[in-house]
């Protein structure tokens, strides 16, 4: 698989660290952010092929981060995979349905995460 630049955004330290390690072992260049504010800072400094982000975080939540990415890069926003234990909550379920972006229900297994990442990076090329 080609090397891609991925940003992992999650306020859960252990999960974020595991995801970063697994994605690096898969050959990707990976940065991480503890929340949406830090993620926006990193997104302002460099471009990413994929953002793997939690839906619920302190400060800027996943939906707000997604909207900011779309506004900053309307011609080529990064691909996104959402993660959450709250995908059944109506506001998040509606948001996920509207965006059409994939979501991983926490807790998820790492093999499933790796498969979704592979699918998003290889089967959904952005122009």
PLM regions with names:
Residues 7, 32-50:
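Acidic, metal-coordinating helix/loop segments flanking the phosphotransfer/catalytic sites
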Residues 17-25:
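Charged docking surfaces used in two-component/phosphorelay signaling
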Residues 35-38, 61-67:
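Acidic catalytic/metal-coordinating carboxylates
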Residues 47-49, 73-79:
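His-Asp phosphorelay/catalytic-motif detector in bacterial-type signaling
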Residues 54:
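Active-site residues of response regulator receiver
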Residues 57:
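Receiver (REC) domain active-site loop signature in two-component systems and cognate sites
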Residues 81-84:
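Hydrophobic/aromatic residues positioned on beta-strands within the core alpha/beta folds
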């Amino acid at each position: 698989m080609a090397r891609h630049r991925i940003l992992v955004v999650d306020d859960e330290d252990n999960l974020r660290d595991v995801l970063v390690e697994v994605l690096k072992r898969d050959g990707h260049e990976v940065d991480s952010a503890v929340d949406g504010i830090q993620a926006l800072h990193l997104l302002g400094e460099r471009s990413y092929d994929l953002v793997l982000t939690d839906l619920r975080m302190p400060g800027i939540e996943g939906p707000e981060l997604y909207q900011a990415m779309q506004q900053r890069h309307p011609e080529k926003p990064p691909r996104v995979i959402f993660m959450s234990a709250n995908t059944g909550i109506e506001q998040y379920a509606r948001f996920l349905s509207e965006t059409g972006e994939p979501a991983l229900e926490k807790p998820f297994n790492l093999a499933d995460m790796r498969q979704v990442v592979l699918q998003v990076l290889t089967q959904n090329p952005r122009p």
